[in-house]
Design a protein with these regions (language model features):
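Bacterial N-terminal signal peptides that target proteins for export
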Residues: 1-8
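N-terminal signal peptide c-region/cleavage motif recognized by signal peptidases
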Residues: 15-20
Length: 155
């Protein structure tokens, strides 16, 4: 029984590692490609949520209102990221949720590292980096998604 449990843990870790991503510019994708391709849709959702979580973590103590706004955007997008992952991997919502949050946590840490390096180099988390453009892109994508949700609800 212990061998099976150990094998399961190794397989779970390995599958999560294979699906984990590294940070890269998100702004290179168009809204059209996001809507037409489930894998791109997931990649953008995962990236934006991770970026929002990183900004939340870095700003919440000093600028609580700003941190809370990013946290709210994260909470808005989380279910859609989980659903997108569930769809492309054919997993249950609960399985996809676990994988999703592990991936987001890993990417968030990478964003924080990148932002801290950039902050030391340029005196800003975003100046001289693709991260500022990505943050704008993610904001526009989130705004579009919220609008689509409101329209689908008839509001």
């Amino acid at each position: 029984m212990i061998k099976i449990k150990n094998i399961f843990i190794i397989v779970l870790f390995f599958s999560n590692y294979l699906f984990a991503q590294t940070i890269e510019p998100l702004k290179n994708y168009s809204l059209e490609s996001i809507l037409e391709n489930d894998e791109i849709n997931y990649k953008i959702l995962e990236g934006c949520i991770s970026l929002y979580k990183a900004v939340t973590e870095l700003t919440i103590e000093r600028y609580p209102d700003l941190g809370n706004q990013f946290s709210e955007m994260t909470e808005t997008l989380n279910p859609y990221g989980i659903i997108a992952l569930s769809k492309i991997q054919g997993k249950t919502y609960k399985e996809a949720e676990n994988i999703f949050f592990n991936n987001v946590s890993s990417l968030k840490d990478q964003y924080i590292d990148e932002m801290n390096k950039n902050g030391k180099l340029n005196g800003s988390y975003f100046k001289g980096s693709f991260l500022g453009d990505d943050l704008t892109f993610c904001y526009e994508t989130t705004k579009y998604l919220r609008l689509a949700i409101m329209e689908s609800l008839g509001e």
